[in-house]
Amino acid sequence: VEQQLKTKGKKKEELPELDTLGELLTGFQVGRLKYSEALESYVRSKFSVEIQGNYIMILAYLGDHYEEERKRTIPALTALLKDTISKKCQILDFLVFKSCLFIFPCEGEEAVLVKRFQKTILTRICNDSMASFGWIRFTGLSQLAESAATLQGCMDWCIPLGNGVIIHYPRIKQLQTSPLSYPVDIENQMKTAICMANPTKLQETFRDFQSYFRKGALYDPKKIKESYLRFI
């Protein structure tokens, strides 16, 4: 019995001291925390949070504008999310991908939450920001890091779809794309403009090149990136 009590005491001592819910989420994000029944009980008692519950993650990709958008757009976005989607929304920095993550319990129908985000937040933010957004539902905070990586791998879809559309996983995997033919004629026009040293023509031709991928057909973002690399 004495040995059992010592073992239980040890287990309690091994539990991390978590002062905020943000610390809990960061712990799972960076791999510092692992699921255990003891941790689950501790978190439920301290934060009234279910580690094994269903959660929504919104990824806000800021890219090269990270520093500026982090200060300017993210505070307003956080307030909007708490007002219209979930008061339990927490924010994490995802520096390796120049992004921020918003995480909250999935309370209610996911389809309703997505629609609300699209109508009340995305349209407003996109008018004044260059951020693009991804959305994923996951079960268990131990899946937080993997879910962020999954969204990261999908964000190239913003290239053909634009920032006004949320990249919703796994729906995004169901999109059908059209074959992409490289615009050789536009490339030849660009070569001519370079030879003529005509900056106006250069700008016009590059705009034509950009417009080529937005003429109604949906192309694989990887193919578009390959075309840009070839063109440049």
Tell me what each language-model feature is.
Residues A111-K119, T123-C126:
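Extended Gly/Ser/Thr-rich low-complexity repeat segments
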Residues R214-K215:
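Helix-capping and short linker residues that terminate individual alpha-solenoid repeat units
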